[in-house]
Regions:
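C-terminal cap/substrate-recognition subdomain and adjoining C-terminal extension
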Residues: 1, 5, 82-206
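Active-site neighborhood of HAD-like aspartate-dependent phosphohydrolases
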Residues: 1-50
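A residue-level signal for conserved active-site and pocket-lining positions in enzyme catalytic cores
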Residues: 12, 74, 125
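Electropositive phosphate-/nucleotide-binding environments in soluble metabolic enzymes
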Residues: 17, 52, 68, 148-152
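Short, surface-exposed acidic
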Residues: 33-39, 72, 122, 166-169
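Short, compositionally biased "basic patch" segments
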Residues: 43-67, 123, 129-130
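Metal-dependent phosphoesterase signature
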Residues: 56-89
Length: 206
């Protein structure tokens, strides 16, 4: 079925800033003695930058707070830290598109472990996946980082499962980043978010 979609990135699109960094800062503030864990984070990111280790290991090290946080704590983080960071004009745009009958997807490199607590009126949340053990989300990544072409792949998988087809001319995509050009090219209407204030303008792609 031909469907009007609105695809939204999350970091610096729906919220200002990097949600993964906010998670780490939030956890360290509550558990300052865990600061030594940052050495492991730096170590794995250095190996990643040197192309010795894959991104998965570095990102999993960064997400170590998930191993220690309960679902209630993760939800509290979303409500107390991420929700106040919303660009209100972009949130209103999302709600407007939903009211107009658009199918709304959030597609982000941020992890589903906390994105699942988003209460916005969206139809799908597609984020980087992490392992679940004994019913609890962990820091260990599963599959690829949901970025660049991976976003297109994830969107296409869900659309196919629902027997839907993107109405190219009438669909929208919102992002702050050139990394999202593959997703932006899935639709005709491409909106750039200014990271300073959330101002929306046409995303010009050559």
């Amino acid at each position: 079925m031909l469907t009007r979609f609105a695809f939204f990135d999350f970091d610096d699109t729906l919220i200002h800033g990097d949600s993964g960094g906010k998670l780490l800062k939030y956890y360290l503030k509550k558990h300052p003695l865990s600061v030594f864990k940052l050495l492991k984070v730096v170590y794995h990111y250095a190996l990643y930058l040197l192309k010795i280790e894959p991104l998965n290991k570095a990102k999993s090290a960064w997400l170590y707070p998930l191993d220690k946080m309960s679902d209630q704590e993760i939800e509290k983080f979303y409500q107390e830290v991420l929700e106040p960071c919303y660009y209100l004009n972009v949130i209103e745009e999302l709600k407007k598109k939903k009211a107009e009958g658009y199918t709304i997807y959030i597609c982000s490199a941020s992890v589903e472990a906390y994105l699942r607590f988003c209460k916005l009126p969206v139809d799908e949340i597609l984020g980087t996946k992490t392992d679940i053990k004994d019913g609890k989300y962990t820091s260990q990544m599963i599959g690829k980082n949901c970025k660049n072409e991976e976003k297109v792949k994830r969107i296409q998988e869900v659309i196919k499962n629902h027997n839907l087809e993107i109405d190219y001319d009438l669909s929208y995509a919102y992002s702050d980043s050139l990394h999202d050009i593959p997703m932006l090219k899935m639709v005709k209407n491409r909106i750039k978010i200014d990271t300073k204030d959330g101002h929306m303008s046409s995303f010009e792609i050559e």
